[in-house]
Amino acid sequence: MTESATPAHTLDCIGLYCPEPLFQAREGIDAIAVGEVLEVFADDPAAEEDLKRFAKRAGHEVVGCEMDGCQLRILIRRLK
């Protein structure tokens, strides 16, 4: 995990299931400035793959991703 990537905004998607974490991440990315980082917490098993795929397709960068038990923490930097 890249700890130097300080989040500008944090989303708590614990308890939400596909596609809700993805929808919230899209809105969260739109709400931050280019260069800032969005932090997302989720426990949906599909969230990691969905959020990584979203970031890649949208032209953003995943700067960190870790699992703590069944809880995902992912950091996405807005690039455009």
Please give the residue ranges for each predicted region.
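Core SAM-dependent methyltransferase catalytic element
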Residues: 73-80
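Right-handed parallel beta-helix/beta-solenoid
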Residues: 2-12
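Short, flexible, glycine/charge-rich loop motifs used to bind or transfer phosphoryl groups or to couple energy/partner
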Residues: 1-2, 28
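Amphipathic, hydrophobic secondary-structure cores in small proteins
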Residues: 11-66
